Amino acid sequence: MATIKQAFKKRIWECSEKYKPTYQISYMENKDIMETEFTVNAASTAQNELQDFWNDFCKDNGLKKNSVVAVVCVG
């Protein structure tokens, strides 16, 4: 498991989309792998935007920030 920043450093993601890409975040919650999606403004700003979205998502859902399993660009 990792944070969004760690996932980007490890390149636990794939992306061919360049305009407003959508990323699927897989994460651990109560021993289950769950998924959510976020759309960012550009691939070049994806890491920072995803980090902000993820922080808010974790706060709203009572999750640990380092529960990320994978980050995949899905469109």
Where would I find each of the regions flagged by the language model?
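Short stretches within intrinsically disordered, low-complexity N-terminal or propeptide regions
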Residues: 4, 9, 44-48, 72
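Short glycine-rich, low-complexity/disordered patches
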Residues: 22, 57-75
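Hydrophobic beta-strand residues in large extracellular and virion-surface proteins
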Residues: 23-27, 38-40, 50, 68-71
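Short, flexible beta-strand-to-coil junctions
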Residues: 26-32, 74-75
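A short, exposed loop/beta-hairpin motif centered on an aromatic-Gly-Thr core
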Residues: 32-46
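Short N-terminal "domain-start" leader segments
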Residues: 1-22
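A short, charged, amphipathic alpha-helix used as a generic interaction element across diverse proteins
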Residues: 43-65
